[in-house]
Amino acid sequence: MHIILLSGGSGKRLWPLSNGTRAKQFLQLLPAPNGVRESMVQRVVRQLHECGLSQNIHFATSLAQKDQLCNQIIGNIQYITEPDHRGTLPAIALSVLHLSENQHCDRDETILVMPCDSFVNNEYYDALKRAIRVTESRSAKFTLLGIQPTSEIPFTRYGYIFAEPPADPTNPYDYCKVIRFYEKPEPDVARTLIMQGALWNAGVFVFKLGDMLDIVHQQFGDTNYADLYSRYSELPKLSFDRMIIEKETNLAVVRYSGKWKDLGSWNSLLEETNVREMGNVMIGQDVVNTHIINELDQPILCVGTHNMVVAATSDGILVSRKDISGTLKHNVDNLEVRPMFEERRWGSYKVISNLTFADGARALTKLLCITAGKSISYQIHHHREELWTFVDGEGELVVDDVLRKVKRGDVVLIKAGQLHAVRATTDLKIIEVQSGTKLIEEDIERFEWTWE
């Protein structure tokens, strides 16, 4: 059995902590059993291990998110990288082609696809095991996990599953045949479905590899992994729920009525963090039910605030009533700003300033934080030069095949077209000033370099 964890998202509903590159599943705000803070994705992987479902875990994710996953997840985890965000159907299609061709999995292999940010307890994973058994018994082509609604509010961001009664009414763990699947219905339809006993779709799909491969070829033609990868960015954005599950007639669902929560708004997230303040924060008088998270060096002082969330990062500052924080995405859509903080496989960087001058020249200043033992790849830039000032730590620098040691106080100018790389001996901090007329992350060409 193989598990595919879907990791995507644009990070708008928890702005400014999340952004286009740091999605909500990577925010390390949740209390973990060992007393530290963990992210949603760390929590899910930990629970899979605890429940004996960690043998073959694969993340379907973007290249940018892969770096963050590598930083947060330790262990034998495999990655299926998507060239672009094209929706759940292309992501699952690319994943099953990878398992078939690159992992040499048999057509009879059972595949479990699930989100990487489900906030659940361990009973949820018992329900997953039941769903796996239903598929392995060939009782249905696809087995879904249906959540017993915990609210009569007709949420339209969920799919709804309308199912027959269990074959064995005395067994609440028995599966049910699905009568119809509704992907994100209108509010009046959702309200009726809840009254009729419909279940929320948990985004879990269990199937046999061979069945899904047949569907991939129906949807994308006579393709293979390399072919689909090469034209991935040209594919339309396609929903697996809408394109496949809504049209499939051979569906089963396993019911689950335990803890299941979408931490997609500030209000829902803060209910589970057990934190009132984080960072450089001062609480004044008459502060009630207010949460403050500050990633900036400057202090935040709150006085007389009631039922508020305040969050400050390099990307911006949010001040919102908790009860309307769920509408944040629509406002963030109107913001046209680049992410000011990004995690990479080698560490992280923070944008300090981004200037444009009268003649069109630009200067972008970053603080690079490289973890000891990690390195930035051997690369060139065609449209910019970089001035590196080493402000802390020690490392090794190579420029055009010439290797030297670097330490605090060293300053190096790297011109456009020069090959360069750096490796941190200790934790290394660099102030990088990029200069040019075209300062974009895509201006990079990588080459091989062996440090030893």
Positions of predicted regions on the chain:
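Left-handed beta-helix
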Residues: F207-L413, Q418-A424, L439, E445-W451
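Residue-level signal for inorganic ion chemistry
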Residues: V41, S95, D117, I161, ...
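A short, charged helix-loop
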Residues: A163-Q196
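Catalytic metal- and UDP-sugar-binding loop of GT-A-like glycosyltransferases, i.e.
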Residues: L6, M114, F390, V433
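N-terminal glycine-rich phosphate-binding loop and ensuing alpha1 helix
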Residues: M1-L69, G75-I77, T81-R86, L94, ...
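C-terminal structural segments of small proteins and small subunits
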Residues: I431-L439
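Conserved beta-loop-beta/alpha segment of the NTase-like Rossmann-fold superfamily
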Residues: I74-P169, L213-F220
